[in-house]
Amino acid sequence: IVCILGTGSNSCFYNGKEIVNNVSPLGFILGDEGSGAVLGKLLVGDILKNQLSPAVKEAFLKQFDLTAPEIIDRVYRQPFPNRFLASLSPFIAQHLEEPGIRRLVLNSFIAFLRRNVMQYDYVQYPAHFIGSVAYCYREILQEAAQETGVSIGKILQSPMEGLIRYHTVPCDQL
């Protein structure tokens, strides 16, 4: 089971030769659970609906110098709202000590595992992850996996790590 958690999210079952199953990611509006875009969407929603502490809301508005109408404009009227929302991930990473933000990430990863990974044979095969979101929040991803009974294999930040290993390590040592 191979999963990508970056700006968007995706998953598939790869049999060693080809992809034999894929749960459609559906994009950040209908799916993309666990992605940077969805984490950003959840963060903005929680901030604008006063679900996080006043200190976090103030820090967010100060750091990004945005008003609520400007955020709405960026999401609904400007191109590439998914990229804008995903660009908020570093703020999330900086504020993981805030229980509401940590819970936001954990719940999104649990949703990704349930709605995507658990549609494959996750009992027999571990799920391997690649992408900046998977890597940066790997401890929370492990917690979500433990809660859902999904076994995690490798978590890589970039595909280059695996490609370099594949092309430099003898085949019998991969």
Give, region by region, the residue ranges found by the protein language model.
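ATP-binding/phosphotransfer module of carbohydrate and carboxylate kinases, centering on a glycine-rich
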Residues: 1, 42-174
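Phosphate-binding/catalytic loop of phosphoryl-transfer enzymes
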Residues: 1-55
